[in-house]
């Protein structure tokens, strides 16, 4: 199985990574193109474009200015240890064994507005550039047009290398829109997580994000290879619901917390 997840806005570049093993992102030439565009933006432009505070806009203007290729553990960090936030809290990379980290490297891919498609051990420098950002660039009016078919092709290549034909989409809609499902060369599965609130099952963003991270970890640590094995996911009180599921959207429910 090849797993797709979103990145996180929250970053941790303070704690040292758990391994000295790293790889370099595949699309740094593309990233440099975007950085050149972003460097032309003032903090005020960034604040308006990204809908962030002046403080965050200033921080990211500085990050764009400091960004440079030639990543090492001195100026960058592996993506899986740098990203924090709900999905990554659920995934809990810090407690993986060396073998599980190696498995994660081959089985997990992180969609990114700036870096395109990241392997977990790819080094990244701090940034904020969400996939849904309407950033005009030489290839179009937003990042979806900038990346075009590139990320879909990269996912197909990663899927072929994995030896599987199942793609488990645990990314948000904003990020998965960078992929063209009809061009994927495998079976696409997009799990849904619903929590009971006031007697009704619904997707609650905070819980669903954590559940996506937990499922990604579950696939890796349990060496899940089939849809039947995926349906056995039962962490944090979730259970598979045949009634609420469809062939491409296995649905997991949890009672009120």
UniProtKB/Swiss-Prot annotation:
Q: Which GO terms describe its cellular component?
A: cytosol
User: Which Gene Ontology terms describe the biological processes this protein takes part in?
Assistant: response to hydroperoxide
The record ties this protein, via InterPro entries, to: YaaA
Q: Which Pfam families match?
A: H2O2_YaaD
Q: Which domain of life is it from?
A: Bacteria
- Say which family it is in: Belongs to the UPF0246 family.
The name under which this protein is listed is UPF0246 protein Shew185_1115
Q: Which organism is it from?
A: Shewanella baltica (strain OS185)
């Amino acid at each position: 199985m090849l797993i797709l997840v979103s990145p996180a806005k929250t970053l941790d570049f303070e704690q040292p990574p758990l391994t000295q093993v790293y790889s370099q992102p595949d699309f740094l030439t593309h990233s440099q193109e975007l950085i050149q565009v972003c460097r032309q933006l003032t903090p005020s432009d960034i604040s308006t474009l990204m809908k962030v505070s002046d403080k965050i806009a200033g921080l990211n203007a500085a990050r764009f200015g400091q960004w440079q290729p030639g990543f090492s553990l001195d100026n960058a960090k592996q993506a899986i240890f740098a990203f924090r936030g709900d999905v990554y809290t659920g995934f809990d990379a810090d407690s993986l064994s060396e073998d599980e980290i190696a498995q994660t490297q081959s089985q997990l891919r992180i969609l990114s507005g700036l870096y395109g498609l990241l392997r977990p051990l790819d080094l990244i420098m701090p940034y904020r550039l969400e996939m849904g950002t309407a950033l005009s660039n030489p290839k179009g009016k937003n990042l979806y047009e900038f990346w075009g078919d590139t990320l879909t092709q990269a996912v197909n290549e990663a899927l072929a290398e994995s030896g599987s034909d199942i793609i488990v989409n645990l990314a948000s809609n904003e990020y998965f829109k960078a992929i063209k499902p009809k061009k994927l060369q495998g079976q696409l599965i997009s799990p849904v997580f619903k929590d009971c609130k006031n007697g009704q099952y619904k997707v609650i963003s905070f819980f669903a994000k954590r559940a996506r991270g937990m499922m990604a970890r579950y696939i890796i640590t349990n060496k899940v290879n089939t849809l039947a094995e995926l349906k056995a996911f039962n962490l944090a009180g979730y259970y598979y619901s045949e009634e609420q599921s469809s062939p491409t959207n296995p649905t997991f429910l949890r009672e009120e917390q």
